[in-house]
């Protein structure tokens, strides 16, 4: 599972899975096991805002920190995403 970054944000790794690149750009947030069970899933819009599809076990504070991080770094994250997927942002589908 490709990680967007090798470090954690609010205690979670941000990543995507190779089988989910058929969807528009999104970010999973999970613990060190990188399991989808209990993970959060954020769809990313072209302005860096996100739509939370699944909150998993994350608290409101953790979700807010991750959303803020994505908003600041979404273009860099999209470059990584685009290496594996031809799908664009959530609001461009």
What are these model-derived regions, one by one?
Residues 1-25:
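Short, charged/polar N-terminal "headpieces" of proteins
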Residues 5-7, 16-18, 33-35, 49, ...:
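Residue-level signal for the start and early helices of compact helical domains
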Residues 12, 20-21, 47-48, 79, ...:
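Short linear sequence elements within intrinsically disordered, low-complexity coil regions
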Residues 15, 41-42, 68, 89:
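Intrinsic disorder/low-structure terminal segments
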Residues 18-61:
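A short, structured beta-strand/loop element
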Residues 54-93:
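Acidic, low-complexity intrinsically disordered segments
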């Amino acid at each position: 599972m490709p990680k967007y970054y090798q470090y954690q944000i609010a205690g979670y790794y941000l990543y995507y899975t190779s089988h989910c690149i058929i969807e528009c750009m999104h970010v999973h947030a999970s613990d060190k096991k990188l399991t989808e069970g209990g993970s959060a899933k954020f769809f990313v819009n072209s302005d860096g805002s996100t739509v939370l599809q699944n909150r998993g076990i994350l608290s409101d504070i953790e979700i807010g920190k991750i959303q803020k991080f994505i908003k600041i770094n979404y273009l860099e994250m999209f470059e990584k995403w685009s290496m594996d997927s031809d799908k664009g942002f959530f609001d461009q589908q």
